[in-house]
Amino acid sequence: MNNLLLYCRPGFEKEAAAEITERASNMQCYGFARVKDDSGYVIFELYDEEQADLLARKLPFRELIFIRQMLVVTHELKDLDLSDRITPILEATQGYAICGDLRVETADTNEAKELSAFCRKFTVPLRQALRGNELLTKKETPHRPVFHAFFLANDHVLLGYSYSFNNSEFHMGIPRLRCPADAPSRSSLKLEEAFYVFVPREEWDMRLTSGMKAVDLGACPGGWTYQLVRRGMMVTAVDNGMMAQSLMDTGQVKHIRDDGFVWRPSKKNTYWLVCDMVDKPARVTHMIADWFRESDCQEAMFNLKLPMKKRYAEAVHNIEVLRELLKEIDNAFVIQAKQLYHDREEITVHVYNKYWVSKLSAKE
């Protein structure tokens, strides 16, 4: 049994299934997806089992939109003896290469959350047993595969592994963030998560630094502006609504009452453009391309709201449209997109120009 296990947002299993089916077939890897609505995961069964490992290594995880985590499943163990779950796990995985990390996980559903406490408690004895059997390094080792135990019930587990160079670094594929007490809205967490997912941590001091100028379109009440302000940026917040007074009191925010689709900066000194406006994805996509065409920003983070039907097709279509529009400007643009944990019926898209980022690096 060598299949792919893919974590996703509950309710988006069909989108994850469509995505893995298309991306795998593009690599001449064929199979079918087993989908259970609202389960928070998809199993992709390959006709050639050896191709599961190939996809786990070669299909770029960062390019996947609706998939939070990707791993190879090698064994499914059911009806485990509750007094000794560890022995059958060790027996099943004797052929594994030594792994550098262990993740005992479950699905991101209300039902599965009841297993979360068990998973935490079970991690310690399982880690000790794996190390004792030379299946896990004595210390966490970033460049080794990750050992996954994905529990569907306390006596039912899927065992597998992912590659640390091509997976999500986060437990269950979810960054653990807390909404700051002084943030104007919980939407603030969307942008914070986007920074964690899209911008390498070692580049934060260069690309998310104090003194940068940023624009937040559709800013009110200021959830996204808050994330920029806390990093020391000077922010122009564009919205006809009211901004949180706590943000205005920082002296870092200039509030312009205008339509975010219409307003443009008078100077070409904006680095970040962020946007969480509710509108048709096509309109937002073309607006973002226009900002780059006019050199009104150098890096952007924005959300695309998805329709109720054909969500995967709509997401892919708009990203392809954006890619073609940006190619007319420069071939150095990079587009990343993900349905983040804090996103709902939407995806977050990140755009930057490799050449412009390299110039920032040169200044360092």
From Swiss-Prot:
Gene3D superfamilies hit by this protein: 3.30.2300.20, 3.30.70.2810, Vaccinia Virus protein VP39
Subcellular location: Cytoplasm
Keywords in alphabetical order: Cytoplasm, Methyltransferase, rRNA processing, S-adenosyl-L-methionine, Transferase
Record-level GO BP terms: methylation; rRNA processing
Annotated catalysed reactions: cytidine(2498) in 23S rRNA + S-adenosyl-L-methionine = 2'-O-methylcytidine(2498) in 23S rRNA + S-adenosyl-L-homocysteine + H(+)
GO cellular component: cytoplasm
Disulfide bonds: none
Binding positions for S-adenosyl-L-methionine per the UniProt entry: S187, C220, P221, G222, G223, D239, D259, D276
Predominant location: cytoplasm
Keyword Transport: no
E.C. number: 2.1.1.186
InterPro entries: RlmM_FDX, RlmM_THUMP-like, RNA_MeTrfase_FtsJ_dom, rRNA_MeTrfase_M, SAM-dependent_MTases_sf
Record-level Gene Ontology MF annotations: S-adenosylmethionine-dependent methyltransferase activity
Record: active site: K305
Free-text function comment from the UniProt entry: Catalyzes the 2'-O-methylation at nucleotide C2498 in 23S rRNA.
Quaternary structure note: Monomer.
Protein family membership: Belongs to the class I-like SAM-binding methyltransferase superfamily. RNA methyltransferase RlmE family. RlmM subfamily.
Entry protein name: Ribosomal RNA large subunit methyltransferase M
